[in-house]
UniProtKB/Swiss-Prot annotation:
The protein's name in its UniProt record: 3-dehydroquinate dehydratase
Biological role stated in the UniProt entry: Catalyzes a trans-dehydration via an enolate intermediate.
Database matches in Pfam families: DHquinase_II
Molecular function via GO: 3-dehydroquinate dehydratase activity
Gene: aroQ
Catalytic activity of the protein: 3-dehydroquinate = 3-dehydroshikimate + H2O
The keyword Amino-acid biosynthesis appears for this protein: yes
Organism per entry: Aliivibrio fischeri (strain MJ11) (Vibrio fischeri)
SUPFAM superfamilies, A to Z: Type II 3-dehydroquinate dehydratase (SSF52304)
Gene3D superfamilies: Dehydroquinase, class II
Length: 149
């Protein structure tokens, strides 16, 4: 990588409640702690991250659109939009930026409606059920992929 790679980290609805909401599923860390750890990790890896959490689908879509020709990789936890948003899928396909889908909980061990993802078949990879560590693993995988290309 000749210039510093830029990675966009997107978090969907209700993830602003991490640490409060259903800690048995989502863990006790809040989103600020997760993003701070990712920022430290990114600095050590020599990459730059940008972060956005939104409960509004259109804001996530606009962030994806604005990433075009500016961002090298996306890490996304679409949260509930995983199971409902064709629009997020289309935005990701439209900008053609590789992405990894992350989920804190194991969505396949939960309610049946959580088993389907509109994004996973287009993702470079999917990490689920590993809690906040999933973001760390996703960042390592993204950097490794960027450095090998």
């Amino acid at each position: 990588m000749s210039t510093q790679s830029r990675i966009l980290v997107l978090n969907g609805p209700n993830l602003n409640l991490l640490g409060l909401r259903e800690p048995a599923h989502y863990g006790s860390q809040n989103l600020e702690q997760i993003v701070n750890a990712l920022t430290t990790q990114a600095d050590a890896l020599g990459v730059e991250i940008e972060h956005l959490q939104s409960n509004r689908e259109y804001e996530l879509i606009e962030a994806i659109h604005n990433a075009y020709q500016r961002i090298d990789f996306i890490i996304i936890n679409p949260a509930a939009f995983t199971h409902t948003s064709v629009a997020l899928r289309d935005a990701l396909l439209g900008v053609d930026i590789p992405f990894i889908e992350v989920h804190l909980s194991n969505v396949h061990a939960r309610e049946p409606f959580r088993h389907h993802s509109y994004l996973s078949d287009k993702a470079v990879g999917v990490i689920c059920g590993l809690g906040a560590d999933g973001y760390e693993f996703a960042l390592n995988a993204a950097v490794k992929r960027l450095r090998s290309n």
